[in-house]
Swiss-Prot record:
Phosphothreonine: modified positions: T347
Chain ranges of the J domain: 51-115
Tissue: Expressed in the fetal and adult brain, testis, uterus, spleen and liver.
Entry-linked SUPFAM superfamilies: Chaperone J-domain
Protein name: DnaJ homolog subfamily C member 28
Keyword set, alphabetical order: Chaperone, Coiled coil, Phosphoprotein
Name of the encoding gene: DNAJC28
Matches recorded under InterPro entries: DnaJ_C_subfamily_28, DnaJ_domain, DnaJ_homolog_subfam-C_membr-28, J_dom_sf
Organism domain of life: Eukaryota
Length: 388
């Protein structure tokens, strides 16, 4: 009876083992199938992506701008409404699909690389770093490597330092033994230099006292008044005031003053040059002279443009807003030169109509000469007013 129970127990045990083990194996088969299907789908998707890249004529790893540019070129060729000989709606649909897939793939790769780079930066950021100023606290920070090696280097360093100190001591001892007067000579030189300096100061003081006794300082302007060391403005630093005074006394000027003078001289030269160019041409001008005049005006406009750039630089450095300058208008300057030329022509015509009459004697002027002189004076005043 016991034998039968034992056999039944063994049979039941075998059935239970099979019931627990075999289904797990059976369950594992679909899992391997899923992995295989996923690997195949991943392979197929990579193959499709490569096909999309090939269809768009771009390489893997390209940027989104390159993908868009390639799509625009292909769309111009295959779009049904493009009117080209290669227009094909089916091809364009495939190209558009490839464009969307490739663009999304490129964006995903870019985002993945950026996130990976940010993670690496965060890791590097929060990673513990030993401060650069922290050295080994033992052995005076001498040496490198293991503690034993650092100790060995430190011993060598101490031996070298001791040898140098001994050499320096022996050197000083020999110097004091064979050159006992060297320190005395050095002290004598310093004392002589000090005596010479004091002698010069005493000489200058004696000369000043002698001049005061003679009365050379009696009639000086500002006698009995406090020295005016600084300017009236209390906000200026005394050091700045002294530096400015030294620069002014030595002929130096601030940069903005030099630029202001340069701008004034340049515009005066340009006005004079265009007026001289207009005088060389006839009145009225021939077609050839008109071409020459147009060329002169173009060159004048270019010079005015360069001058306006210098005015911009001047306005940036000038310390006072009221000192800033406005741009010069080339057309207004050309019209001004024309008016001055016309005034000169009219003045010349008046002078030619009323020739000088010098028969009345020396030092006597006719009304015509006075009138011509007044016209020239008015013209000169007009030129000066227009230039400022």
């Amino acid at each position: 009876m016991n034998t039968m129970y034992v056999m039944m127990a063994q049979i039941l045990r075998s059935h239970l083992i099979k019931a627990t083990v075999i289904p797990n194996r059976v369950k594992m088969l679909p899992y391997f199938g899923i992995i295989r299907n996923r690997m195949m789908s991943t392979h197929k998707s990579k193959k499709k992506i490569r096909e999309y890249y090939r269809l768009l004529n771009v390489e893997e790893g390209c940027s989104a701008d390159e993908v868009r540019e390639s799509f625009h070129k292909l769309a111009k060729q295959y779009h049904p409404d493009s009117g080209s000989n290669t227009a094909d709606s089916a091809t364009f649909i495939r190209i558009e699909k490839a464009y969307r897939k490739v663009l999304s793939h490129v964006i995903e790769q870019t985002n993945a690389s950026q996130s990976k780079g940010e993670e690496e930066e965060d890791v590097e950021k929060f990673k513990y770093k030993t401060p650069q100023h922290r050295h080994y606290l033992s052995f005076e920070g001498i040496g490198f490597g293991t503690p034993t090696q650092r100790e060995k280097h430190y011993r060598q360093f101490r031996a070298d330092r001791a040898a140098e100190q001994v050499m320096e001591y022996q050197k000083q001892k020999l110097q004091s033994q064979y050159f006992p007067d060297s320190v005395i000579v050095k002290n004598i030189r310093q004392s002589k230099q000090q005596k010479i300096t004091q002698a010069i100061e005493r000489l200058v003081e004696d000369l000043i006292q002698e001049s005061m006794a003679k009365g050379d300082f009696d009639n000086l302007s500002g006698k009995g008044k406090p020295l005016k060391k600084f300017s009236d403005c209390s906000y200026i630093d005394p050091m700045t005031h002294n530096l400015n005074r030294i620069l002014i006394d030595n002929g130096y000027q601030p940069e903005w003053i030099l630029k202001q003078k340069e701008i004034s001289d340049t515009i005066e030269q340009l006005r004079e040059a265009i007026l001289v160019s207009r005088k060389k041409l006839g009145n009225p001008m021939t077609p050839t002279e008109k071409k020459q005049w147009n060329h002169v005006c173009e060159q004048f406009q270019e010079n005015i443009r360069k001058l306006n750039k210098r005015i911009n630089d001047f306005n940036l450095i000038v310390p006072i807003l009221t000192r800033q300058k406005v741009h010069f208008d080339a057309q207004k300057e050309i019209v001004r030169a024309q008016k001055i030329y016309e005034t000169l022509i009219k003045t010349k015509e008046v002078t030619d109509r009323n020739p000088n009459n010098l028969d009345q004697g020396e030092g006597e002027k006719t009304p015509e000469i006075k009138k011509g002189f007044l016209n020239w004076m008015n013209l000169w005043k007009f030129i000066k007013i227009r230039s400022f």
